[in-house]
């Protein structure tokens, strides 16, 4: 099973009001859930996400890759920046969905890459409220070589084309 099926397995058994997803290569700061709870008390959303960043202990190559993946220059701010060229789509490295969302739109599909973007697109299409919690960041470990990073970006490019076939509005220049 891939990441989508594993997350669905957990969601089918979850009993809480929200299902929270992280990637296995993320480090969650101790204040994360307090930050999310404070935000949800002020403004209830059905789907939320937060940014990812480099931990101070990461290697120089990981920090460089992180910059290329989180800077406005590298992504147009689409990965959780207050400044963005497009709509914010929560991604499963740092994402929470309400039980109502899961029961209405279902879980993640079986795409190997991009299953989280597909879910976020379906959540928007169903009319649910989506929010960015900028202070609910995670430390996301990056690839340790340029070769591994290239492979990751290549796979994401394939995913972007597949997502464009499922959701034409997602296939755009950023």
Regions found by a protein language model. Name each.
Residues 109-171:
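Catalytic donor/gating beta->alpha subdomain of glycosyltransferases that bind UDP-sugars
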Residues 23-27:
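The conserved acidic donor/metal-binding loop of glycosyltransferases
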Residues 1-14, 35, 85, 92-93:
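Glycine-rich, basic loop-to-helix element that forms the pyrophosphate-binding segment
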Residues 15-16, 94-105:
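Conserved nucleotide-sugar donor-binding
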Residues 87-97, 117:
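Short glycine- and hydrophobic/aromatic-rich loop-to-beta-strand nucleating segment
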Residues 30-63, 136-137, 141:
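Conserved donor NDP-sugar-binding/catalytic core segment of glycosyltransferases
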Residues 19:
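Short aromatic/hydrophobic "clamp" motif used to bind/position activated sugar donors
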Residues 50-56, 65-88, 103, 161, ...:
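Short, flexible, basic/aromatic active-site loop/helix in glycosyltransferases
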